[in-house]
Amino acid sequence: RECRSQSKQFVGLCVSDTNCASVCLTEHFPGGKCDGYRRCFCTKDC
């Protein structure tokens, strides 16, 4: 199962999953994706 948490450090509109994932790595998450509202959500297995 995958858990999602909105990124605390991502700034601006999320248009690139790669950029989102890079910011999430600095927040100690293994990955991240943009959602439909252009926000960055960090993901991890839970």
UniProtKB/Swiss-Prot annotation:
SMART domains per record: Knot1
One GO biological process term: defense response to fungus
Signal peptide: none
Disulphide linkage map: C3-C46, C14-C34, C20-C40, C24-C42
InterPro entries recorded: Defensin_plant (IPR008176), Scorpion_toxin-like (IPR003614), Scorpion_toxin-like_sf (IPR036574)
Keyword Cell cycle: no
Keywords: Antimicrobial, Disulfide bond, Fungicide, Plant defense
PROSITE patterns tied to this protein: GAMMA_THIONIN
Record Pfam families: Gamma-thionin
Function: Plant defense peptide.
Family listed: Belongs to the DEFL family.
The protein's name: Defensin Tk-AMP-D6.1
